[in-house]
UniProtKB/Swiss-Prot annotation:
Gene Ontology CC: one annotated term: cytosol
Positions bound to 5-amino-6-(D-ribitylamino)uracil: F22, T56, F57, E58, A80, V81, I82, M113
Record gene name: ribH
Entry EC number(s): 2.5.1.78
Record keywords: Riboflavin biosynthesis, Transferase
Protein name: 6,7-dimethyl-8-ribityllumazine synthase
Organism: Anaeromyxobacter sp. (strain K)
InterPro entries associated with the record: LS, LS/RS, LS/RS_sf
HAMAP family assigned to the protein according to its UniProt record, in alphabetical order: Lumazine_synth
Pathway noted in the entry: Cofactor biosynthesis; riboflavin biosynthesis; riboflavin from 2-hydroxy-3-oxobutyl phosphate and 5-amino-6-(D-ribitylamino)uracil: step 1/2
Length: 162
């Protein structure tokens, strides 16, 4: 049995962080956490680019363009959708999730999602590093691991049909 796994060593990886400006009190903390996680896993600061878009709904379009450049091994989407009094929360959350998943399926690189979908600002801040860890950092670490597993798959020897 051959096992292919990604490592959490990001040395030599090029990464992009795509961050929504809306709910910036939360998204800036996600960005700080993601950048710190990349650094801790060996990705050089000079190998990380940050792209900002207006809101979380716009993330998939920007992700698609960033991925299409072919310059990155790992791309991380960062945003926050906070429930309000209308069904807008459900629509945005669902469409962003579908959009990021679609980009990830078609990408030739690792694409991960650090988008919070929370019931309150307090809950979002907790998940952005105040109490419950930083989901931006988690998404960045997952991107490093995913980039490495994709590299391992690309290097795997071809098997002859029996």
């Amino acid at each position: 049995m051959n096992v292919y796994e990604g490592s959490l060593v990001g040395t030599g990886l090029k990464a992009a962080l795509v961050v929504a400006r809306f709910n910036s009190l939360v998204t800036e903390q996600l960005l700080v956490g993601a950048a710190d996680a990349l650094r801790r896993h060996g990705v050089a600061d000079g190998d990380v680019d940050v792209f900002r878009c207006p809101g979380t709904f716009e993330l998939p379009a920007v992700l698609r363009r960033v991925v299409a450049t072919g310059r990155y091994d790992a791309v991380v989407a960062l945003g926050a959708v906070i429930r309000g009094g209308t069904p807008h929360f459900e629509y945005v959350s669902a469409e962003v999730t579908k959009g990021v998943a679609h980009v990830a399926m078609e990408a030739g690189c690792a694409v991960t999602m650090g988008v919070l979908t929370c019931d309150s600002m307090e809950q979002a801040l907790e998940r952005a590093g105040v109490k419950a860890g930083n989901k931006g950092a988690d998404a960045a670490a997952a991107a490093v691991e995913q980039a490495n597993v994709l590299r391992a798959i690309a290097r795997a020897p071809a098997r002859k049909a029996e």
